[in-house]
A protein has these predicted regions:
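Conserved glycine-rich beta-strand-loop-beta hairpin in the small C-terminal domain of fold type I
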Residues: 80, 97-107, 119-133, 143-146
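Active-site PLP attachment segment
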Residues: 24-59
Length: 205
């Protein structure tokens, strides 16, 4: 058995040193490393990569040597040259600065809004999203329904959990990468209004 390490969003770490990958510390050759350029360059590039431990490399070549990549050779060679010339690292540095500024702006706007006193920011040091724990007794489904009635679409952490638990309730997932910051204050006010009306009867349990 092997561990599949999907190092998604690892390039965007804003606090502290990069965390070593499991693959880099694996001495038993049981970790397969996966990553993609879709977030760091563009989703349309559709180029990902996989690092295999030596003991699996020959098996891969034997069993899957016939596999044909769907990405054109031209795009692969262009990306390879981009990396070889050091342009990728320069690009990544610019993107990290841009997203750090965007993240800081979103956190600041949340703190300045009426929602601020009922929201606790979590997991904001890496990736292009963070979590916000809301102070509310509303079930997540009811919170989402009431928000939808005000034109808001909320992504809750419990939506991604196959076994929802109380410890993961009331946690909002905020993806700020493509967020329109000019509309955020109004959205935060609408969400604050939803929490203001918490005492209204729930439509579901």
């Amino acid at each position: 058995r092997c561990i599949l390490e999907d190092d998604y969003d690892s390039e965007f770490r804003f606090v502290g040193r990069p965390i070593p990958t499991l693959f880099s510390t694996d001495e038993s050759q049981r970790v397969i490393y996966l990553n993609t350029f879709s977030k760091t360059i563009a989703p349309s590039i559709r180029i990902s990569y996989m690092l295999l431990p030596p003991r699996l490399l020959e098996r891969y070549r034997e069993k899957l040597g016939f596999y044909a990549c769907t990405v054109s050779s031209f795009e692969q060679y262009t990306l390879a040259e981009f990396i070889r010339q050091g342009r990728y690292e320069q690009h990544l540095s610019r993107m990290k600065n841009r997203y750090r500024q965007r993240r800081d702006a979103v956190i600041r706007l949340i703190g300045e809004s009426r929602l601020g006193e009922r929201a606790r920011i979590m997991e904001q040091d890496a990736g292009l999203h963070f979590l916000v724990r809301l102070v509310t007794a509303l079930p997540d489904g009811e919170l989402q329904r009431r928000a939808a009635a005000r034109g808001l679409r909320l992504a809750m952490l419990s939506d991604y959990d196959s076994r929802p638990s109380a410890g993961r309730a009331h946690i909002l997932v905020v993806n700020y990468a493509g967020m329109d910051l000019s509309r955020l204050p109004e959205a935060l006010e609408r969400l604050a209004q939803v929490l203001d009306e918490e005492e209204l009867p729930c439509t579901t349990n």
